[in-house]
């Protein structure tokens, strides 16, 4: 039921489902249907989508340890790249639509405002993950080095959730939930790594 073949078959549908929100928000933005502050709304939606996809990517890694769901890992790369896609749109909206490429102001903003600092560092950490996501790069780097590079997904997720937490001024329930999920997934990863030698014995 949960074979690699079935998960691969679901990719086209999943691709459309994940891509669709960005097209919808772009249409709503162009037609003036994103509320009274469309640029802020667009940034918020794109950023939140990116964070959710990052968390889903981490969850796939954990779920793939469950034998019947092992093949779900074939979806991880596509979802991870979509997370990068949404982060790029989020950041582009910030620098182009919100600040009109005023790089001096943007650099000062990144330095002075902690939540933007967290978000920017998270974005920088995502770049090597996206750029080494192909099979060709895995072969070139070697699996061990590639795997070490892709551990960056955890600081990416933590920084992204901190970005969201500091940004939210009122009800922080949602960012706290996301941070909690990320911490649990990270603890599971650490526990698995620490107990692996014992299991091998």
Model-derived segments and spans:
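Membrane-embedded alpha-helical bundles that constitute the cytochrome b-like, heme-associated redox core
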Residues: 1-201
């Amino acid at each position: 039921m949960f074979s690699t073949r079935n998960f691969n078959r679901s990719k086209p549908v999943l691709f459309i489902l994940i891509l669709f929100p960005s097209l919808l928000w772009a249409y709503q933005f162009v037609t003036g249907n994103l509320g009274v502050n469309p640029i802020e709304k667009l940034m918020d939606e794109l950023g939140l989508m990116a964070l959710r996809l990052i968390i889903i990517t981490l969850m796939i890694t954990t779920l793939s340890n469950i034998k019947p769901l092992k093949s779900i890992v074939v979806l991880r790369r596509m979802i991870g790249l979509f997370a990068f896609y949404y982060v790029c749109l989020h950041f582009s909206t910030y620098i182009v639509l919100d600040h009109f490429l005023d790089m001096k102001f943007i650099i000062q903003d990144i330095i002075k405002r902690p939540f933007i600092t967290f978000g920017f560092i998270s974005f920088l950490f995502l770049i090597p993950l996206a750029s080494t996501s192909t099979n060709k790069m895995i072969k070139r780097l070697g699996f061990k080095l590639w795997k070490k590079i892709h551990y960056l997904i955890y600081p990416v997720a933590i920084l992204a959730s901190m970005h969201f937490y500091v940004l939210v001024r009122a009800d922080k329930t949602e960012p706290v939930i996301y941070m909690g999920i990320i911490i649990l997934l990270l603890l599971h990863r650490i526990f698995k790594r620490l107990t692996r030698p014992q299991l091998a014995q």
